[in-house]
Curated annotation (Swiss-Prot):
It comes from the Eukaryota. It comes from Caenorhabditis elegans. This is Uncharacterized protein F42A8.1.
């Protein structure tokens, strides 16, 4: 009887012990779970070891806490803590911030070829036309375009700076479209820079720096003579020749167009081929303007003309003489000699009795009209 009572008491105690142990296990399991939203679901209990994604980060439920494991890239690739990855032309590191929370940290800049560049480093674009720099900008790094590559493909020209190449000045500029390039902004002549629109002399010609089709060109717009600037069509005189400034596409010249003479006290231009007369009461001298070798002109005396009773009757070339019988006057004649002078010629009218004295060195010619 007493033994049965002892067995009953032991059985009851055993049941209580098992029940208590089971309750302890259940409490521990409950404390190991995590309560949070994630994986696109509302807040719920997550079991020990479950991975939970929240925003751009992922965690693991450990002992009732969410332990950060890493970050998610833009392609949803999982990046473990402490590892780097490339995204949007930058290199990021998945890290814990100073506040203990997981975050993305900028690590370096990335070129179009996939190479990484640390803070302060520079590199060029694929075509070697401009260059970048990886700049420190507080908590982030930024890729900035720093300047252009010069035309020799060697030197670097910072934004806003100029560079001279092959007779022209170029400036590194960033256009409103964002394109960065060397833009033509001026011309260079004999070491002097000229901006667009400025004029300069080069020998016998006048040029100006013109912007055409986005590029500067050196356009000839005129001539230089006697220290004066002349433009297309304008004329000037030099050494008895009249010149005209002619500017044509692909061609320019100081073209001789006439003879410069003094007539009645005035400077007169006679075009090439023109004929004119220097008058006297009984005779006149015919002259013409003609070319004289390479781009020069000269005044040539064509001859002397004898006038009789108001009409031109006899023509003589310089250096010749003749005897002319006067009309309607029997046995009456006159001697005519066209003698060369320093400025042309003169007609000598003489008595035939003085023929030898007035015709020395001259050649006889039959009398003829003009």
């Amino acid at each position: 009887m007493q033994n049965n009572l002892v067995l009953l008491i032991l059985s009851i105690l055993s049941i209580f012990e098992v029940s208590a142990y089971s309750n302890v296990e259940k409490g521990a399991a409950a404390r190991a779970r995590c309560w949070t939203s994630g994986n696109g679901r509302p807040a719920q209990w997550w079991q020990e070891g479950d991975q939970v994604t929240r925003g751009k980060y992922f965690y693991e439920c450990r002992r009732g806490q969410l332990e950060p494991l890493g970050c998610l890239s833009s392609t949803e690739e999982k990046i473990p803590l402490g590892h780097t990855f490339q995204q949007d032309r930058y290199e990021f590191i998945c890290q814990l911030g100073s506040d203990g929370y997981i975050e993305f940290g900028y690590s370096a800049c990335v070129g179009t070829d996939g190479r990484t560049y640390q803070k302060g480093e520079t590199w060029t674009d694929a075509k070697n036309t401009y260059y970048y720099r990886c700049r420190d900008d507080g908590r982030v790094v930024k890729t900035t375009i720093e300047g252009c590559i010069a035309h020799d493909k060697q030197r670097r020209v910072p934004l806003g700076q100029t560079d001279d190449f092959n007779g022209y000045t170029y400036k590194c500029q960033q256009k409103t479209t964002g394109v960065v390039q060397m833009c033509s902004v001026g011309c260079i002549h004999e070491g002097t820079r000229y901006t667009v629109g400025q004029q300069y002399r080069d020998g016998d010609y006048l040029f100006y720096c013109k912007l055409q089709g986005g590029k500067c060109t050196k356009q000839c717009i005129g001539c230089v003579a006697g220290g004066q600037d002349l433009y297309d069509g304008q004329r000037y005189k030099r050494d008895g020749t009249t010149y005209q400034c002619e500017i044509r596409p692909g061609k320019r010249s100081h073209r001789a167009v006439g003879c410069s003479i003094v007539e009645n006290g005035r400077d007169i231009n006679k075009v090439i081929g023109c004929r004119w007369y220097e008058q006297n009461p009984d005779w006149k001298i015919e002259k013409t303007c003609e070319t004289d070798g390479d781009n020069k002109t000269k005044v040539t005396t064509v001859g002397c003309i004898y006038k009789y009773k108001g009409f031109d009757r006899i023509f003589l070339e310089p250096g010749k003489y003749t005897i002319w019988n006067l009309p309607k006057q029997k046995d009456s004649s006159v001697g005519l000699a066209c003698r060369k002078t320093a400025d042309g010629a003169e007609l000598v009218i003489f008595d035939v009795a003085q023929l030898e004295r007035n015709t020395s060195g001259l050649k006889y010619d039959l009398p003829r009209g003009k």
